[in-house]
Amino acid sequence: MGYSWRDAAWERDMRVAQGKPLNVLPHLERGSGPSVSAPWQVKIEPGFSSFVGRTQDIRGYVNQLLTHVRSVVPPNALPQTPIYIMATAGMRMLKPEVRQAILLETCRVIREQPFYFDPDVQDYAGADTDTACGGHVRVITGEEEGMLGWLAVNY
């Protein structure tokens, strides 16, 4: 799912200048340009948990997702656009070492792409088996999944 929002400092300054309240969430926008009519989200099947024992197949799967991202993000904005891949319930049910293998391979694939990553972020997950790529690839909690579902429905 993709969202676009204004620079926070600019939004604050604009609200102050116009006498608008600061305690209101900013409006999320679809952005501009020729890609504005493209859908903001894409879901492909099966989920990440289906790659148990076959992490070598993750590249093609992730590339399907990234092809969609490239259709809505202008090419000149890719290096400033962070990518986050958030896995849900199916991945939470897997053994920690299996989750970690899938997350790490997903991290390796997206690190090869032209998107923004903090240069200090390492590919490894360390002791945390639910996160890789400094949080760019992770298994979200049930609470986070519910919150993001609410956002998707309401925005």
Q: What does each model-found stretch correspond to?
A:
Residues M1-Y3:
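A short acidic Gly-Thr/Ser loop motif
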Residues R6-Y155:
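Nucleotide/phosphate-binding catalytic cleft detector across ATP-hydrolyzing
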